[in-house]
Amino acid sequence: MQVTETLSAGLKRGFTVTVPAGELESKRTARLKELGQSMNLPGFRPGKVPLSIVKQRYGDAVQGEVLEQAVSDATRALMDERGLRPAMQPRVDLVAGAEPGGKADLEFKVEVELLPDIAQPDLSTLSLTRLKATPDAETIDKALKDIASRQRDFETIEDVRPAAQGDVVVVDFVGKVDGVAFEGGTAQDVNVELGGAGFIPGFAEQIEGMSPGEEKVITVTFPADYSAENLAGKEATFDITAKALKRPVDVEIDDEMAKKIGFEGLEQVRELITRQVEQEYEQLSRLRIKRELLDALAEKTDFEAPQGMVEAEFAQIWQRVEADRKAGELDEEDKEKDEDTLRADYRKIAERRVKLGLLLAEIGRANAITVSQDEMLQAIRAEAMRYPGQEQQVFEFFRKNPQAAESLRGPIFENKVVDYVIELATVEDKDVTPEELAEIPPADL
């Protein structure tokens, strides 16, 4: 094999590789002989078919197979011999030697973008702040009120009067699109709480003021991201019949309420809520310190990012941006930007992500951080639990799709590296309010 370097610019390298025709011919002949050993033809003993006949039948297929293997082997040898670490799959273009008959040397070009050399930062110099919040009585009381509101009963309002905020209107309705009733759009004795949530925007608002016995036609527009795709974004009418009014009856927050929902008493409910809130605060605290850590590491990414990786990351980000724009969910700040500015901003985010990913990977590699089989199994089990009754199918999916399993490995590895770095850093605990803990930093990770 002969190799000539044709490009060396930044992280990009280019080579011309030549594999002698004789070497290819030897591999072709060996492969044809191998096929001949198992070939059966009338008039010939098993394994005794002449090579010329084997070549006539399988020559083109073997030619392609040998060329593909030769290119793969030569490219891998090139990378190994020169100690090159590709950032992505090398690009290969055949120049000569791919013609049927295979009499010429095989010549092809290889273009590859390399991973940068990354210096190990001194992680012990990092200073981080761990935000800590404690559940207060107000938070626990609010959670108890939310539980009580879900347990409340309703009593019928005997007076015939227009429905007002806070009332529950019992209605029958028939929904139509373009004058035709649609599936799932007809129901009887539905409770609509005025001022509550759970209905299409504008639905409950137009029922306010109706009295029992009154009929009305209202018009609403389904949200663009509505779960039923055949209705998403469409205008619909609903024939409404108000049948009765009810008012909610508050439930006392006491031991009796606790027993109704399966607890021994109110104190047990308080303890459970407190543990749940503490876990929520711990998760928020970890997200905040992880963000602070990544911001600190981003300042140490003074190396070039492989542009192929940046482009691939940007493509994924931009796909989500386009989906948000189509659904009308682009945030207000992005809505005000022109296309070029928006692309430039998200390209910077893509480059930051690639650099941080490479730095974390290098820290993990240098410190022998790996993801164990047990950790992978736990991740797959957690994923399977999201699909009750289909756990076995989920396990089979990951067994047959190693790339899908790798998508679970990445976050586990990243979190292990983050934990490792936090252990080495100087961490100061800081007490904050729940509101301060919940503040969301700009989403540029």
UniProtKB/Swiss-Prot annotation:
One Gene Ontology term of the molecular function aspect: ribosome binding
Protein name (record): Trigger factor
**InterPro entries recorded:** PPIase_dom_sf, PPIase_FKBP_dom, Trig_fac, Trigger_fac_C, Trigger_fac_C_sf, Trigger_fac_ribosome-bd_bac, Trigger_fac_ribosome-bd_sf, Trigger_fact/SurA_dom_sf
Gene Ontology CC, one term:
cytoplasm
Q: Which family does it belong to?
A: Belongs to the FKBP-type PPIase family. Tig subfamily.
Q: Which UniProt keywords apply?
A: Cell cycle, Cell division, Chaperone, Cytoplasm, Isomerase, Rotamase
Q: What is known of its domains?
A: Consists of 3 domains; the N-terminus binds the ribosome, the middle domain has PPIase activity, while the C-terminus has intrinsic chaperone activity on its own.
